[in-house]
């Protein structure tokens, strides 16, 4: 992860601010990787305090034991009103060891409007030497009044090649390539795929859905996979299979004609959009398979 982050424009801008002495009082880091958000905020903190992971101060930052660096919320918790009040109170106190303090918040997009409002005044006019980095997977839930008080840095999804290289650095696995292609540019998603046995189940489900050619089988397949936990990842794996069939002519979807494969990819994009609107997944799968099968039969006639 460190190697990936240090190549990003967001990280380079932040480093430039630190080195030029023009550091903003508050940053908002948009980064879609919830799994790795805390680790990335710590990398930014190392740069803020001008230290490295191999140095004593760097070790304390990474272990969250340096009193002038506070990372919220606790692992697995949600940033709430009590934590916001604690930050407001703590920010008014002088740094314990150095000349500045850094507050980092992971998953800020999950904070309610009430909680975000509690920080507005402190974000706008923090005490001297106090700085903030707010990490959010999405900017949409963040209040405009908060966004107007911070400098926004964005880390876009990584390329498939970058994800694969990062996975290979973590360890060789026969799942690395497929995980990199199915993760939509999010390393944490790919890491979870490789680490969990569920990814093989997901691959099998995608293969079965993409291979269906009989309308009579669709209902049973939709019921079988309609409750799958990793819905977005399933659609991404299906997309990978269709694209592979379109370019190489093989795989689970290889029996479909090129027009049918293009149509399937278009319908997948529609399905992904409907999923974001909380569409019932079993029905979504059923309609998708039915549309593809019917289109395939029409083009064959």
Regions found by a protein language model. Give the residues of each.
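Residues immediately C-terminal
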Residues: 78, 110, 125, 141, ...
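Loop/turn-to-beta-strand initiation segments
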Residues: 98-102, 127-133
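Conserved beta-strand scaffold positions in the cores of enzyme catalytic domains, especially
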Residues: 69-71, 152
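Charged, glycine-rich active-site and insertion segments that engage polyanionic ligands
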Residues: 1-62, 128-130, 137-301
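Conserved alpha-helical scaffold flanking the Walker A/P-loop in AAA+ ATPase domains
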Residues: 12-18, 81-102, 109-110, 114-121
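A short beta-strand-to-loop transition that corresponds to the Sensor-1 phosphate-sensing loop
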Residues: 106-108, 134-139
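A short hydrophobic beta-strand->loop->alpha-helix junction that borders the nucleotide-binding pocket
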Residues: 30-32, 71-76
């Amino acid at each position: 992860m460190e190697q990936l982050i240090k190549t990003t424009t967001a990280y380079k801008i932040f480093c430039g601010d630190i080195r030029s002495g023009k550091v903003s009082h508050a940053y908002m880091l948009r980064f879609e990787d919830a799994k790795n958000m805390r680790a990335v905020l710590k990398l930014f903190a190392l740069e803020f305090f001008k230290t490295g992971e191999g140095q004593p101060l760097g070790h304390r930052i990474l272990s969250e034991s340096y009193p002038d660096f506070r990372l919220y919320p606790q692992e697995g918790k949600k940033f709430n009103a009590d934590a916001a009040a604690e930050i407001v109170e703590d920010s008014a106190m002088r740094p314990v060891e150095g000349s500045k303090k850094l507050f980092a918040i992971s998953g800020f997009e999950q904070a309610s409007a009430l909680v975000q409002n509690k920080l507005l005044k402190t974000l706008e006019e923090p005490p001297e030497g106090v700085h903030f980095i707010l990490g959010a997977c999405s900017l949409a839930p963040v209040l405009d009044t908060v966004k107007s008080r911070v400098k926004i840095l964005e880390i876009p999804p990584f390329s498939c090649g970058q994800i694969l290289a990062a996975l290979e650095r973590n360890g060789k696995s026969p799942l690395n390539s497929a995980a990199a292609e199915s993760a939509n540019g999010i390393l944490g998603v790919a890491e979870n795929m490789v680490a969990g046995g569920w990814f093989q189940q997901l691959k099998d489900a995608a293969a079965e859905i993409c291979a269906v050619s009989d309308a009579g089988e669709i209902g049973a397949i939709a019921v079988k996979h309609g409750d799958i936990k990793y819905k977005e990842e399933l659609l991404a794996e299906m997309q990978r299979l269709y694209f592979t069939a379109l370019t190489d002519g093989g795989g689970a979807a290889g029996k479909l004609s090129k027009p049918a494969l293009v149509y399937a990819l278009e319908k997948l994009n529609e399905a992904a959009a409907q999923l974001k609107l909380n569409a019932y997944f079993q029905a979504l799968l059923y309609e998708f398979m039915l549309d593809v099968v019917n289109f395939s039969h029409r083009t064959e006639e």
